[in-house]
Structure formats: C-alpha cells, structure tokens
C-alpha cells in the first residue's frame, strides 16, 4: 500500500470583532466554549486532524483579528489559504453588511489563482440568542449571489452545526488544495512565437 503525503489545509476565519470566530474555532477543535470575551490580538491558529472522504488531513485554522487596526498584520496570514470562512453575528446587522468588504479584502490580500472559484463558507453565528436581526433568507440570498457560497447557521455556545460546517470547510479546502497541486504539476505549456521557433530549429540543426 503506497503512503500518501500528509495534507495541511490552511483555513482563514474572517469577520468583525465579537462575532464568535474564536469561539467557533475552540468549539470545533477543543469542544469548549467560554462566556468570557477576549479580543484576539493579531492572529492565532489551532490545528485539528480530520478525515475527509477517507483521507486524513490536518486543518490549520487561523483566527484573524477583526479590528481594523490589526488588518495590516494579516496579509501574510492570508497567503496560501485553501478556504476562507466569513462569520457574522445574526443579532448584529452591521456584521452582516461587512461580509462584502471582508470577502474583497481576502481576495486582494491572498491573491488566489482562481478568485472566481475560490472556496468560501459563510457562518451566521449566535443563533442561540433570541434577538435575531438578520433573516435566514437574506443571508442565503447574499451567499447565493456570491457564486453560491455554502451557508450554515451556527451556535458556538450550543455546538449547533459547528461540526457540519467545518466538515464542508475541510472538504472544500481539500478540493482547492488538490486543484492547486494539479496546476503546479502540469503548468501551462510555454508558447513560442515564430522567431523563437526559427531560432530553436537553427540551434538544433547539426549541419
């Protein structure tokens, strides 16, 4: 049986400060939730080994700070990402409105090879709270308008849909990683113009 190389998937979680990015990450990786809120300074990551379609992969999940003043630190963290998770708080409409700018920010900073088809996943978090302000249909419509991004409604506190969401994140990230590998293995052939072809023919002539 041939051993397959270990796959490391880099996942970036973006969204405004306080939407629950760190809580979602901790719930998924450590099965823990804390009511004590502490803003993430800069960026931090956790890793978790998961099975994706009978393949063992390591997910490296990056939690990037939501405050504007830390965004300049994030450029290096965006690079090499295999999937981007956009998180908003269903009780705070402003955090939903900024999803557009977070998505654009990622595409600019990460510069993925195929931005049109890069895998995003949207999470509407804190559905355990009663004062909901962003309707499911509104979030679904936004996600659909952005190349049909998968959308999940989650609660980091109650562990609702967290596992399911990250399974989709892992699967889409693995697909992205595989496509990049194939692209690197079979790069586009070089195109020669007429002068180059004539020069090549002359150089290979043994007369």
Swiss-Prot record:
Per the Swiss-Prot or TrEMBL annotation, the motif Switch 2 is positioned at 67-82
Q: Where is this motif: Switch 1?
A: 28-41
Reaction(s) catalysed by this chain, per the record, are: GTP + H2O = GDP + phosphate + H(+)
Residues bearing the modification N-acetylthreonine: 2
Keywords annotated in UniProt: Acetylation, Autophagy, Cytoplasmic vesicle, Endosome, GTP-binding, Hydrolase, Isopeptide bond, Lipid degradation, Lipid droplet, Lipid metabolism, Lipoprotein, Lysosome, Magnesium, Membrane, Metal-binding, Methylation, Mitochondrion, Nucleotide-binding, Phosphoprotein, Prenylation, Protein transport, Transport, Ubl conjugation
Residues recorded with modification Cysteine methyl ester? 207
| Location(s) in or outside the cell | Cytoplasmic vesicle, Phagosome membrane; Late endosome membrane; Lysosome membrane; Melanosome membrane
Pfam (any one): Ras
* Gene Ontology molecular function, alphabetical: G protein activity; GTP binding
Q: What enzyme category does the UniProt record give?
A: hydrolase
Q: Where is the lipid attached (S-geranylgeranyl cysteine)?
A: 205, 207
One GO biological-process annotation of the entry reads: phagosome acidification
Residues that hold GTP according to the record: 17-23, 34-35, 37, 40, 66, 125-126, 128, 156-157
Give the position of the cross-link Glycyl lysine isopeptide (Lys-Gly) (interchain with G-Cter in ubiquitin).
191, 194
A GO term from the CC aspect: phagocytic vesicle
The UniProt family comment states: Belongs to the small GTPase superfamily. Rab family.
Oligomeric and partner information: Interacts with NTRK1/TRKA. Interacts with RILP. Interacts with PSMA7. Interacts with RNF115. Interacts with FYCO1. Interacts with the PIK3C3/VPS34-PIK3R4 complex. The GTP-bound form interacts with OSBPL1A. The GTP-bound form interacts with RAC1. Interacts with CLN3. Interacts with CHM, the substrate-binding subunit of the Rab geranylgeranyltransferase complex. Interacts with C9orf72. Does not interact with HPS4 and the BLOC-3 complex (heterodimer of HPS1 and HPS4). Interacts with CLN5. Interacts with PLEKHM1 (via N- and C-terminus). Interacts with PRPH; the interaction is direct.
Known role: The small GTPases Rab are key regulators of intracellular membrane trafficking, from the formation of transport vesicles to their fusion with membranes. Rabs cycle between an inactive GDP-bound form and an active GTP-bound form that is able to recruit to membranes different sets of downstream effectors directly responsible for vesicle formation, movement, tethering and fusion. In its active state, RAB7A binds to a variety of effector proteins playing a key role in the regulation of endo-lysosomal trafficking.
Entry text on domains? Switch I, switch II and the interswitch regions are characteristic of Rab GTPases and mediate the interactions with Rab downstream effectors. The switch regions undergo conformational changes upon nucleotide binding which drive interaction with specific sets of effector proteins, with most effectors only binding to GTP-bound Rab.
This chain's protein is named: Ras-related protein Rab-7a
Q: Which organism is it from?
A: Oryctolagus cuniculus (Rabbit)
Gene for this chain: RAB7A
């Amino acid at each position: 049986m041939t051993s397959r190389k270990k796959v490391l998937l880099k996942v970036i979680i973006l969204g405004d400060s306080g939407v629950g990015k760190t809580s979602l990450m901790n719930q998924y990786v450590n099965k823990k939730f804390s009511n004590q809120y502490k803003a993430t300074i800069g960026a931090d990551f956790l890793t978790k080994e998961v099975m994706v379609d009978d393949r063992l992969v390591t997910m490296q999940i990056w939690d990037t700070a939501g405050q504007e003043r830390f965004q300049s630190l994030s450029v290096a963290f965006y690079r090499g990402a295999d999937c981007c998770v956009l998180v908003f708080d269903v009780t705070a409409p402003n955090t939903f409105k900024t999803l557009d700018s977070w998505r654009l920010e990622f595409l600019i900073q990460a510069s993925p090879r195929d931005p049109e088809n890069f895998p995003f996943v949207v999470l509407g978090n804190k559905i355990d709270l009663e004062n909901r302000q962003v309707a499911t249909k509104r979030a679904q419509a936004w996600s659909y308008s952005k190349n049909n991004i998968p959308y999940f409604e989650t609660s980091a506190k109650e562990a609702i849909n967290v596992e399911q969401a990250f399974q989709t994140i892992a699967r889409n990230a693995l697909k992205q990683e595989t496509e990049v590998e194939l692209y690197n293995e079979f790069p586009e052939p070089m195109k020669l113009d007429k002068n180059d072809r004539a020069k090549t023919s002359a150089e290979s002539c043994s007369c």
